[in-house]
Each structure stands twice: as structure tokens, then as C-alpha cells.
Amino acid sequence: MEQNSRALIDGFNRKIDYLRMSVTDRCDFRCVYCMAEDMQFLPRQQILSLEELFQVAERFVALGTRKIRLTGGEPLVRQGIVELCGRIAALPGLRELCMTSNGSQLGRLAQPLFDAGVTRLNISLDSLDTDRFKQLTRTGDLAQVVAGIDAARQAGFKRTKLNCVVLKGRNDHELVDLVRFAIDRELDITFIEEMPLGTISEHERGESFCSSDEVRERLAGQFTLIESTESSQGPARYWRLAEAANTRVGFISPHSHNFCATCNRVRLTVEGRLLLCLGNEHSVDLKHVLRAHPGNPERLEKAIRDSLHLKPYRHHFEVGGEVQILRFMNMTGG
């Protein structure tokens, strides 16, 4: 990777070159680990406009960011999202523009997103059972999501990745089937330990926790897992399958194998808070900077640079412990 003299370096000498941007807190699903069933969403005036989102993206790319991931809520329910993708994708120096989606809108938007310059998709898929999928998402239609997954492949997306949050007693018996689903479609799949964000009522996190080591041990009974050194510039650790050359299995393990030492990313909430760590509340209000100093990229750049001293070395998630972070995942950016 080329060095940029303006690159963002935090207090622990970690280069920050990956920005996760939430473009909306709204979603057409109500996943049990992500938000409350009666979630109250932000009024429009409190969220960043598409132009403000672009201005932040432009500044980060100018400061050496090489990967941007658009998240939500569900990013595809934000009006104007395809046009925003096209503008961000065209920024000189950006290598990857990725998106995390629940897949519900990909049937109609996969091709426009690909044409706009989105390079990769992550699609959430927590169950292959229609009823269980509905229970976990509260409102989701499995057939619609599968159609969206297939539409992404037809549109030309490569290395599409499925994301599965593993909940013991709810979907952990589907692990092998989910991998086989990924193999059949030549997709990658990542299993994620649930992150303790927001107070939920659907399950007890301590009881539903399933570690990445346990998931890997179960999969090893059916597949030959070969550890890989490949990276997607994010927190996932990957294994290849001897049985399937075109599928990788990844693990994101915030509890059992935290990835803080090599953290290269920050998050922008749709409210304009620049979060320096997923598991801490250290943040800077970029919305205030954008609105108090419109059309002043130097002030925005200074705020971004000054924020880095707030980035902690690590989070301190605890399985089953008292919730320390009250914001839900949809407010953070999944």
C-alpha cells in the first residue's frame, strides 16, 4: 500500500484507512440482536444529508482511506443511495466501496449498485428456515433475501459474503447448512459473535453466546478447514475449505479473539458522530463541524485528525455482563 503523507495515524501507531459509514438508522427488518421491536427512528433533520455524507467520505479518502463500507440500518432504504454510491466510488484513491445489506432490496437494486461502482456486498443471512428467519428478523422474508443474493451474483458482484450472527439455541444448529448454501453459490460466509450493543428482550446474551472456536469445531466435523492469511481489511479471520475452492469461512470474534490490536477503522453514525471504537463511546460530532462551517473542508479535516487521540487501544465487551453501550447496532452502523 502506498504511503500517504497525510495518512491518519492513531495514538497507538495504527494506520486508519477504513471508514464505515451509516447512511440511515432505518431498516425494513427488526433483527432481535440489532434493535428493539418498537424502535424509534431519528427525525430527518438529525441525520446527515447525502451531500454531508459525501463530504465526509471525500475528506477521509483525501486522508488516505482506501476502503469505505456503507451500512445502516439498511442502507438500501435510504433514498438516493445509488447516486451517493456513484459519487463516492468515483473518488480518486478509493480502492473499495462496499456495502452491508439485509438483501431485501437487492432484487431491484443489485444491478444499479454494481453499475454505480460498488465493489463488494456483505449480506446478512442468519437462518435458512423460513419461520426461524421471520422470528429472528421479526419482519423479514427469506425468499426475498435469497432472491437478492442471487441477483447480486447475476449483476456481477464477486466475493459476496454472507454474515451470520450465531445465537446458541436459535440458529447454531444451522451452521453446516449455511456453509453448504454458501458453497452452492460460491459465496464466502462469516460467523459473528453477537455484540452487546443496546438492551434487548428477546434473549439473554450470556445464554445465547456461541464462541467462534465452538463454531469452528462444529464445522471441522463436516469440512476440512485450512487457515488462511487472506484479509478483507476488516476484523474477520478466514479459513479455506478443502472441499470448496471458491468459498471461505470467516469468523468475527469480538469476545473470544478481539481484533483491537490491528484496528484500522472508524465509524460514522448517521447522526454525524465519528465513533473511534465500536465498544466505546469516544466520539466527535462531525455534523456540528459540517453545519457550523459549511463548505470548509479544512475544518472538517482538522476535526477528523484531532479525533484520533480519542481512539482507545481496545474495547472491553463482556459476555453476559451489564450492557455498557446503550446505542443499538442500527444506530451504530452494522
From Swiss-Prot:
Its cofactor is [4Fe-4S] cluster. GO terms for biological process: Mo-molybdopterin cofactor biosynthetic process. The keyword Lipid metabolism does not apply. [4Fe-4S] cluster 1 binds at C27, C31, C34. [4Fe-4S] cluster 2 binds at C260, C263, C277. It catalyses: GTP + AH2 + S-adenosyl-L-methionine = (8S)-3',8-cyclo-7,8-dihydroguanosine 5'-triphosphate + 5'-deoxyadenosine + L-methionine + A + H(+). Residues 11-236 form the Radical SAM core domain. The keyword Lyase applies. It is an enzyme of class 4 (lyase). Pathway: Cofactor biosynthesis; molybdopterin biosynthesis. S-adenosyl-L-methionine binds at Y33, G73, S124, M195. CDD domains: Radical_SAM, Twitch_MoaA. InterPro entries: Aldolase_TIM, Elp3/MiaA/NifB-like_rSAM, MoaA, MoaA_NifB_PqqE_Fe-S-bd_CS, MoaA_twitch, MoCo_biosynth_MoaA/MoaC, rSAM. Catalyzes the cyclization of GTP to (8S)-3',8-cyclo-7,8-dihydroguanosine 5'-triphosphate. Belongs to the radical SAM superfamily. MoaA family. This is GTP 3',8-cyclase. It comes from Pseudomonas putida (strain GB-1). The gene is moaA.
